[in-house]
């Protein structure tokens, strides 16, 4: 192999050192070098870059427990693989843990707190774990009694009595649970499960119907973005736009009220949209009121526009305090748009957090603390044990108190950012500056215009790629294409 030695004269060394970076530089950037020569000071246009990645995909769907039960009623092993009442009925009886009640009017034992024959309130009897006798006392034979016992019950009797009381044909499939997990093995009335099956709804562990959604913040909206008529918005209190002009067209910009919520109704989603689920939930509750409780209907919903103005409860998974919200419209996204206050009242923010919504009347009629699993955390978390009806900004999570509410940032802000100073070194109007004043509820400003909140990607590829392996392959392929991404770093994560 031939080697060629190239010799350069000394005066060319400077150029070669620059080209091949053979010498260490002085440590100044190109911009600093230009400014050292220029009479006009140039600013850094690019600023500071930060890298981000998707934490979790968007979500808006009905919550379903394992097996998709429609009622918190145990069918035991007799319910088969599907845990269905139809399979259990074919076996006539089922064996599981049930509470023991007695009807003094009919002189019969039952598993309900009200008699399925006469409708009168029954007496709850406790069971001694030693002598097996029923008693009203908390103690017997020197030990504590418990509120249930292992029983073989005639499932046909309870199912047929429910169908007769409701006066409707039996659904083809009604699914229960293998066994209840609450302390006293309290069960839901089968009538509720039959009506949920009719309306194709699923029950949650506390007896309610939940719709899970990704949380998204919003302070302003246009009527065209949420599909609500001008007259309806006026009825809800939106009479003027942010400039003080009377509301007349769907292009005007409105400031959302702190407890108003825009629900998701994405046409591209493979899951059922919020309007579909809540319409069916309203119809279920109306049937429950009329056929089970013998009361007049309340919602009378026929279209999604009929849902506008109705109240919901927002509840984060790790809390036990719900906040009242009011439906004012539907977006075409897969997220729950609401005021930052409303999310903060649930101790949540917008970094991929998830909340759920349930109808107020659903919680009032069907929620019971006695249904909750007897496990640490399950006894109190993700359950509407407390309900906040009026949102007070000073009482919500303090993270939102640091939210900027100005329409522009001063020059000092950009100079401070250039010098990497702390955010609190520059005075910018924030929520904490208006707490306790009228301005804490209205008059918020923003810095960037948005033509339509429904624009952009409404359904990411992550949602419809079928398998996890294909999702990972897609993520790595994207990382390989993006020059700013480190493929090895993405793979390591």
Model-derived regions, located:
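Conserved core architecture of multi-subunit DNA-directed RNA polymerases
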Residues: 1-493
């Amino acid at each position: 192999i031939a080697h060629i030695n190239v010799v350069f004269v000394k005066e060319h060394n400077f150029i070669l050192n620059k080209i091949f970076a053979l010498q260490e530089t002085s440590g100044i950037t190109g911009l600093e070098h230009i400014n050292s020569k220029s009479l006009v000071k140039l600013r850094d246009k690019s600023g500071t870059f930060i890298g981000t990645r998707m934490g979790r995909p968007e979500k808006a769907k009905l919550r379903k427990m394992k097996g998709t039960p429609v009622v918190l009623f145990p069918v035991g092993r007799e319910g088969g693989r599907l845990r269905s009442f139809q399979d259990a009925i074919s076996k006539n009886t089922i064996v599981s843990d049930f509470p023991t009640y007695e009807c003094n009017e009919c002189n019969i034992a039952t598993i309900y707190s009200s008699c399925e024959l006469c409708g009168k309130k029954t007496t709850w009897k406790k069971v001694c774990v030693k002598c097996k006798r029923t008693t009203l006392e908390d103690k017997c034979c020197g030990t504590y009694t418990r509120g249930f016992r292992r029983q073989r019950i005639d499932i046909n009797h309870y199912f047929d009595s429910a169908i007769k009381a409701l006066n409707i044909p039996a659904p083809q499939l009604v699914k229960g649970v293998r066994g209840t997990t609450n302390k006293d093995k309290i069960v839901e009335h089968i009538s509720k499960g039959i009506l949920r099956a009719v309306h194709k709804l699923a029950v949650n562990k506390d007896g309610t119907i939940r719709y899970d959604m990704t949380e998204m913040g919003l302070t302003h909206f246009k009527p065209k973005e949420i599909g609500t008529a001008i007259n309806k918005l006026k009825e809800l209190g939106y009479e003027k736009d942010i400039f003080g002009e009377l509301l007349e067209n769907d292009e005007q910009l409105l400031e959302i009220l702190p407890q108003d919520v825009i629900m998701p109704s994405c046409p591209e989603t493979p899951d059922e949209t919020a309007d579909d689920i809540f319409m069916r939930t309203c119809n279920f509750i109306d049937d429950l009121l009329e056929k089970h409780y013998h009361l007049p209907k309340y919602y009378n919903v026929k279209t999604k526009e009929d849902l506008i103005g109705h109240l919901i409860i927002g509840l984060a998974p790790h809390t036990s305090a719900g906040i009242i919200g009011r439906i004012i419209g539907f977006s075409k996204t897969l997220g729950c748009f609401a005021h930052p206050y409303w999310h903060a009242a649930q101790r949540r923010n917008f970094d991929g957090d998830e909340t759920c919504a349930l109808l107020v009347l659903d919680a009032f009629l069907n929620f019971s603390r006695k249904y909750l699993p007897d496990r640490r955390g399950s006894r109190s978390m993700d359950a509407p044990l407390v309900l906040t009806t009026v949102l007070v900004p000073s009482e919500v999570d303090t993270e939102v108190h640091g939210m900027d509410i100005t329409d522009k940032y001063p020059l000092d802000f950009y100079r401070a950012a250039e010098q990497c100073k702390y955010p609190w070194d520059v005075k910018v109007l924030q929520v904490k500056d208006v707490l306790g004043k009228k301005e804490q509820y209205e008059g918020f400003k923003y810095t960037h215009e948005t033509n339509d909140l429904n624009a952009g990607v409404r359904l990411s590829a992550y949602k419809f790629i079928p398998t996890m392996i294909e999702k990972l392959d897609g993520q790595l392929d994207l990382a390989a294409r993006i020059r700013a991404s480190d493929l090895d770093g993405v793979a390591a994560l």
